[in-house]
């Protein structure tokens, strides 16, 4: 289960925990320190500071999900990696022989989607592991 600490990732965590509980599976919680995000912010704040801040974000995000999973009686492994998110997620899932990937979608539309793409979309296109995506609560409200 990849997380970025967002509301969408938290919603996806609920689904991941439920799925793991129903199938007596363990949960791997992954946070990726995005190199692109680091390089965009580095000129203003410095690479080391950015990486440290994102590492702390990752520790908070993964521990919150791990605590929820543990409360449901699930074994949990947390990991923080650096790189391009879609590549890291795909590689990690293959390395741990994941049965599934559950992740949120960020709901990018228009020019943002064209320029930035979708991590979930890239994961789906590049992995053989089944992927379940969970829409952001904001996306669901927009559809109503």
Q: Which residues are covered by each model-predicted region?
A:
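Gly/Ser-rich helix-loop-strand patches that form or flank binding pockets
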Residues: 95-144
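Small/aliphatic-rich secondary-structure junction motif
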Residues: 1-42
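Short, well-ordered secondary-structure micro-motifs
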Residues: 12-13, 39-43, 90-91, 113-115, ...
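Acidic, proline/glycine-rich short linear motifs
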Residues: 33-57, 143-144
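Structural beta-alpha unit
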Residues: 67-101, 138-144
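A structural signal for isolated positions on well-ordered beta-strands in alpha/beta enzyme cores
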Residues: 26-28, 77-79, 132
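Short, solvent-exposed amphipathic alpha-helices that sit
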Residues: 15, 53-65, 88
